């Protein structure tokens, strides 16, 4: 007879939550899940191994009496309807961990190649004028020389400019290479990982238009200018408070400097605004 393993309902619920699986979905794969949850039955070790793989959790975590405290390793700047977003998903945590490991490796590699601290990192303060900082960013990234006329080309040129000054830029809509683990833009739009040698920006591209990706790239770059790692996103592209609002303003001013605003003078409808906004790689929301 197969050995049974004691599991707790809070841990099973936590595993489902972090993997964004519902009880009903899991029940189609594990017919005795209800028994495990109410304590009237226990899974075999093989059952639990399959459940761990299904929920993308470790077997060790599933046999603990209480769920582990999985705190975000970087500052959480996200809000939804003006409230903080409480518990991160396993997809988000695993994505941050994946790129932290890559950043650590690249940091050591870059040092071996003689890399030094990038001078623009930590060079700004949230008390600085967003317009002033935006002008510095446009100069640093040489965006005044960009001839893009559409949001996709702007995305290409912004990524190239960031990489050109030493920023690692990563984009994906899934966890690693797993197409079954899709990232949610409702949960986050991107994050920045500060490092003197190997600063990194990650953009969640799952179902995100290029205009939103452009904004996120520059928003996260603004966090690096402040010298911080940060997780950004939620239910609004614009808005927020404190540092997040400052980074939003910088990103908007980089994409739409004062001299570009005259291009909207003849726009009279939303369609007009959208057409002009695309020329500058932004959404109508940012333009308005």
Language-model regions, residue ranges each:
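Short juxta-domain linker segments that transition from a proline/glycine-rich
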Residues: 1-288
């Amino acid at each position: 007879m197969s050995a049974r393993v004691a599991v707790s309902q809070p841990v099973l619920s936590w595993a489902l939550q972090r993997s964004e699986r519902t009880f009903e979905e899991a029940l189609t794969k594990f017919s005795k899940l209800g028994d495990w949850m109410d304590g009237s039955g226990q899974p075999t070790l093989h059952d639990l191994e399959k459940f761990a793989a299904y929920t993308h959790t470790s077997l060790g975590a599933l046999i603990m009496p209480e769920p582990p405290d999985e705190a975000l390793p970087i500052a959480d700047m996200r809000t939804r309807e003006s409230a903080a977003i409480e518990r991160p998903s396993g997809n988000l945590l695993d994505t941050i961990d994946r790129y932290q490991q890559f950043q650590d490796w690249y940091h050591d590699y870059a040092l071996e190649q003689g890399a030094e601290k990038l001078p623009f990192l930590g060079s700004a303060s949230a008390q600085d004028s967003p317009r002033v900082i935006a002008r510095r960013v446009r100069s640093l990234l040489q965006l005044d020389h960009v001839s893009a006329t559409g949001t996709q080309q702007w995305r290409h040129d912004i990524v190239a400019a960031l990489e050109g000054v030493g920023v690692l830029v990563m984009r994906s809509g899934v966890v690693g290479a797993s197409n079954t683990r899709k990232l949610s833009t409702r949960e986050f739009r991107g994050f920045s990982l500060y490092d003197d040698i190997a600063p990194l920006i990650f953009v969640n591209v799952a179902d995100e238009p290029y205009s939103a990706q452009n904004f996120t790239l520059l928003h996260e770059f603004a966090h690096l200018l402040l010298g911080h790692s940060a997780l950004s996103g939620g239910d609004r592209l614009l808005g927020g408070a404190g540092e997040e609002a400052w980074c939003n303003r910088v990103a908007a001013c980089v994409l739409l400097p004062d001299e570009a605003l005259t291009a909207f003078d003849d726009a009279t409808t939303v369609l007009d605004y959208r057409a002009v906004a695309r020329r500058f790689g932004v959404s109508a929301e940012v333009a308005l």
